[in-house]
């Protein structure tokens, strides 16, 4: 079975609650339609082409590169970000009283084609989909959330909460994307070996940010320079790093509670840890109303079941809620909110037909809406588990 064989097989449409109309207002609202582009690159291309400062563009979230997606963004009304290029189009649709942001995203509607489904397996997928529509699925954060974790499993934010600021800066400056070129990998390895020798590192710093960070450490040796360098990180980067670590701890808390149940379990392999799921209908009852807080300095103010589970996870890591209070110079903070333990797909449809690209196979088509913050990829991975063999991650230890 294949998902995302072509971008058209994975369509995402963002839904927002930002009030807007056609009458002129403070902010111009746009749709961004893209295929095989990531969100940031698409908006930046439009900004360069129109001469609009990148800093005035606001949007709700990043959408998958390997997909066909529609989402929203804003600029101040004085600008016009209209833009079209191969596989990307920015179109003005009206005006809004406030800029677009993550808080305005209600969720996303997904339309997904699963190809090369063996004959007979489509019925299993359909049965599993019906179960998920009735009972929901555990609402773990999926692997996309953990882009800030290194190959060793270390999190930037964990260094920060442990007050190892040199380790945090080292993580940021020496980590690289899994698809980075061999030249970048070699340069990052050299930076890691020379860490602390700021004069040597100056010759390896090639981006403006790297040069500025090394400059801080040269001008102010010791912790002061390192704190100044960390203060150069953008709010977006801080947000990604902090939410990544919080989400990993949240997943651990939910997994801890699931493993303590009496239900039979199976598991999915995650980038950070193994994620246990109920084999049958364990998401019924109290699980449907369970809220688990994100780890933060506010945790100690609650004593519900979810808070206790997060507290136990923090204790296992040798951390306390007050560790999540950050140095003011970072201009960043850990968000404090609760997340549902179970997500139920809405507006679902399921269909099965002959695969027009793979003779002798079926294709499944599933459409559904998920609230903001929930992961269609996790729903699809769980759906695949109904198929025996390589397409399933298989049962894991309970």
Question: For each predicted feature, which ranges?
Answer:
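Acidic, low-complexity intrinsically disordered tails
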Residues: 395-398
């Amino acid at each position: 079975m294949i998902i995302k064989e072509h971008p058209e097989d994975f369509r995402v449409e963002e839904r927002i609650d930002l009030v807007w109309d056609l009458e002129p207002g403070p902010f111009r609202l746009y749709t961004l339609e893209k295929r095989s582009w990531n969100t940031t690159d698409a908006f930046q291309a439009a900004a360069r082409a129109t001469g609009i400062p990148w800093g005035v563009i606001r949007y709700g979230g990043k959408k998958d590169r390997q997909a066909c997606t529609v989402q929203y963004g804003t600029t101040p009304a004085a600008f016009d970000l209209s833009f079209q290029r191969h596989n990307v189009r920015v179109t003005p649709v009206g005006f809004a009283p406030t800029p677009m942001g993550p808080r305005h995203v209600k969720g996303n509607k997904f339309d997904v084609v699963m190809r090369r489904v063996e004959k007979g397996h489509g019925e299993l997928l359909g049965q599993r989909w019906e179960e998920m529509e009735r009972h929901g699925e555990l609402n773990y954060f999926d692997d996309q959330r953990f882009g800030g974790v290194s190959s060793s499993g270390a999190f930037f934010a964990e260094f920060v909460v442990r007050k190892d600021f040199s380790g945090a800066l080292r993580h940021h400056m020496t980590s690289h994307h899994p698809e980075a070129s061999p030249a970048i990998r070699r340069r990052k390895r050299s930076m890691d070996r020379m860490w602390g020798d700021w004069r040597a590192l100056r010759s390896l710093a090639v981006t403006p940010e790297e040069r500025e960070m090394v400059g801080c450490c040269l001008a102010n040796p010791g912790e002061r320079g390192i704190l100044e360098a960390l203060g150069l990180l953008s709010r977006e980067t801080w947000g990604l790093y902090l939410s990544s670590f919080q989400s990993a701890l949240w997943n651990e808390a939910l997994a801890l509670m699931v493993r303590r149940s009496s239900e039979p379990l199976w598991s999915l392999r995650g980038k950070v840890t193994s994620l246990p799921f109920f084999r049958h209908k364990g998401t019924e009852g109290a699980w449907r109303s369970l809220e688990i807080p994100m780890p933060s300095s506010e945790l100690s103010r609650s004593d519900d079941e979810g808070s206790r589970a997060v507290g136990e996870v923090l204790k296992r890591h040798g951390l306390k809620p007050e560790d999540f209070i950050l140095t003011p110079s970072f201009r960043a903070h850990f968000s404090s909110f609760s997340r549902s333990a179970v997500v139920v797909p809405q507006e679902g449809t399921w269909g099965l037909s002959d695969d027009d690209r793979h003779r002798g196979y079926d294709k499944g088509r599933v459409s559904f809406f998920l609230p903001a913050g929930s992961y269609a990829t996790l729903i699809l991975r769980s759906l695949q588990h109904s198929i025996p063999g390589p397409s399933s991650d298989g049962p894991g230890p309970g």
